[in-house]
Amino acid sequence: MTGKECFLAAMNLLGEQEEGAAYYETFALGALRQLMNNCLREINALRQADGKEELKIAPQPGALEDALDADEAMVRECFPYGLAALLVCDEDHEKFNWLGSEFAARLDRHCPAAQFLVKELY
């Protein structure tokens, strides 16, 4: 999924028409970068489950046309809700709360638990 596709899905959740979404588009790339940063733990949990090496920093899209470099299913299921929430956080608190809750719930259901060793202290 590209950043633009995610943005259009977020606009659909907000009930915005593409031509009326120009205002939000100015903030979309920064918000997507923030989502990638916020989801690094989940990105790494999915990478670990696939046998891939963990990332130290989240991948950052350079433009909205770039593909979002994370698990495709997670991005498609979760990111439109998170992006929509970030885009309306200052203007519609009710939508922000619903979208943020939906984003968090979908992320929790989608991502595996991170596995790690427990250090014996005694």
Region locations from a protein language model:
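Short conserved catalytic/interaction loops centered on acidic-Pro-aromatic/His motifs
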Residues: 92-100
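Structural motif
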Residues: 24-25, 68-78
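Conserved short "hinge" loops at termini or chain/domain junctions
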Residues: 1-64, 98, 106-122
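Residues in soluble alpha-helical coiled-coils and helical-bundle/repeat scaffolds
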Residues: 19, 90-91
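Active-site-adjacent structural patch at catalytic or cofactor/ligand-binding sites
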Residues: 62-66, 81-82
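Short, hydrophobic/amphipathic alpha-helical patches that form generic packing surfaces
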Residues: 77-90
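Small-residue hotspots
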Residues: 85, 100-103
